[in-house]
Amino acid sequence: MGKSQYVTGIKKMPINERPREKLLNYGPESLSNPELLAIILSTGTKEMSAIDLATHVLSYSEEGLRHLKNCEIEELQQIKGVGIAKASQILAAVELGKRISLTSRVNHYRIKSPDDVSNLLMEEMRYLKKEYFNIALLNTKHEVIAIENISIGSLNASIVHPREVFVVAIKRSSSAIILVHNHPSGDPSPSGEDIRITKRLVEAGKLLGIEVLDHIIIGDNVYYSLKEKSMM
């Protein structure tokens, strides 16, 4: 029922105004945000076409498109017309966009200071609602090879084990690494556990010949460098 009504709604539109046809004829850059999201959603509901539903999703928050960047699946499902399937489609598209964006910025990005780490990862990590512990893998020139996630959730020594960190670094032939994690509270001040984990990883790195250059904690548009504060 929903699909047939969606098709009828689309068929009422002039051919050159239909999202898919616009994309094929003029390229994706010619589409509005609701039109792009409508293609991802594919179908609407009994009451709304895919474009109407996409507009509804984007207007759910004052932040609009930006809100989707760190939205949880449960939050999306609270929007009328969005079930688990459509929520999954949205999150998959958002995550793919994040990865493409990060990959394009990471390639040969050289780290010379904590500011460089912040410039690279602040926007990716400042709005995250859970703690993400990532490592930046560097070559001999301190250029970023990749950013790898090690754990998600509250940081503690049982989760962030040296083995999990350095097996990734060794596989990617990293000469050095930088630890990066976020504080969802927005306050980047390190906890006692943050400091203990850092020191443990620094010692493990010395044994393996892979230097831990810094541990950057990301807050809300502010960061804390344990190296700068002589805490490692």
Swiss-Prot record:
CDD domains recorded for this chain?
MPN_DUF2466 (cd08071)
Q: Which organism is it from?
A: Alkaliphilus metalliredigens (strain QYMF)
Q: Which InterPro entries match?
A: MPN (IPR037518), RadC_JAB (IPR025657), UPF0758 (IPR001405), UPF0758_CS (IPR020891), UPF0758_N (IPR046778)
Protein name per the record: UPF0758 protein Amet_2289
Alphabetized UniProt keyword annotations: Hydrolase, Metal-binding, Metalloprotease, Protease, Zinc
| Ranges where the MPN domain occurs | 110-232
Q: Where is this motif: JAMM motif?
A: 181-194
According to its UniProt record, what is one Pfam family this protein matches? RadC
Sites where the protein binds Zn(2+): 181, 183, 194
Question: Could you read off the lineage of the organism from its UniProt record?
Answer: Bacteria, Bacillati, Bacillota, Clostridia, Peptostreptococcales
Q: Which NCBIfam families match?
A: PRK00024.1, radc
Family of this protein? Belongs to the UPF0758 family.
GO biological process per UniProt: proteolysis
In terms of PANTHER family, this protein maps to: DNA REPAIR PROTEIN RADC, UPF0758 PROTEIN YEES-RELATED
What would be an example GO MF term here? metallopeptidase activity
